[in-house]
């Protein structure tokens, strides 16, 4: 059954320690099975570890990491006359942030440190310094968009 109106965007409650809405969104994405306290423990532990290991402001480093991972372009499939083209399109700001969060979490989970705290802090530090799997994912996305620039006139 279709909706009569578009669903309203819900306001995200800022996280308890830093009062940051984007960090709260990150926490919600990291969470499994509604276990928010576990996600909180992981994130705050990673922030503490970043502060001790690299002596940096963890919140600023987190935002730098997100900024470095956010893609500007992506490709979307467009079917034209029996052929499917990968058409490069600009990414909306909210989707850019969502993709960056998703990629950082996926890259952190794929790392081989012992605890998730260590993995997340390592990936955030790498992303803030333009290294790591999440940044590579963004570069691959941009490369794909650049390779398919010839089809950009199919944009919709």
Swiss-Prot record:
Q: Write out the entry's keywords from A to Z.
A: Ribonucleoprotein, Ribosomal protein, RNA-binding, rRNA-binding, tRNA-binding
SUPFAM superfamilies the UniProt entry points to: Ribosomal protein S7
GO CC annotation, single = small ribosomal subunit
Q: Give the record's GO biological process terms.
A: translation
- Role, per record: One of the primary rRNA binding proteins, it binds directly to 16S rRNA where it nucleates assembly of the head domain of the 30S subunit. Is located at the subunit interface close to the decoding center, probably blocks exit of the E-site tRNA.
Subunit text: Part of the 30S ribosomal subunit. Contacts proteins S9 and S11.
NCBIfam families in the record, alphabetically? rpsG_bact (TIGR01029)
Q: What is this protein called?
A: Small ribosomal subunit protein uS7
């Amino acid at each position: 059954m279709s909706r009569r109106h578009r669903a309203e965007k819900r306001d995200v409650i800022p996280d308890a320690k830093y009062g940051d809405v984007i960090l709260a969104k990150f926490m919600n994405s990291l969470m499994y099975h509604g276990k928010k306290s576990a996600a909180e423990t992981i994130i705050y532990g990673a922030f503490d570890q970043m502060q001790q290991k690299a002596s940096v402001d963890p919140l600023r480093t987190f935002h730098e990491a997100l900024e470095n991972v956010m893609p500007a372009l992506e490709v979307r499939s467009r079917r034209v006359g029996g052929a499917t083209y990968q058409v490069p399109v600009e990414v909306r700001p909210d989707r850019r942030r969502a993709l960056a969060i998703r990629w950082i979490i996926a890259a952190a989970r794929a790392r081989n440190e012992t605890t998730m705290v260590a993995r997340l802090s390592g990936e955030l530090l790498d992303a803030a310094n333009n290294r790591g799997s999440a940044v590579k994912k963004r570069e691959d996305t941009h490369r794909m968009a650049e390779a398919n620039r010839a089809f950009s006139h199919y944009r919709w």
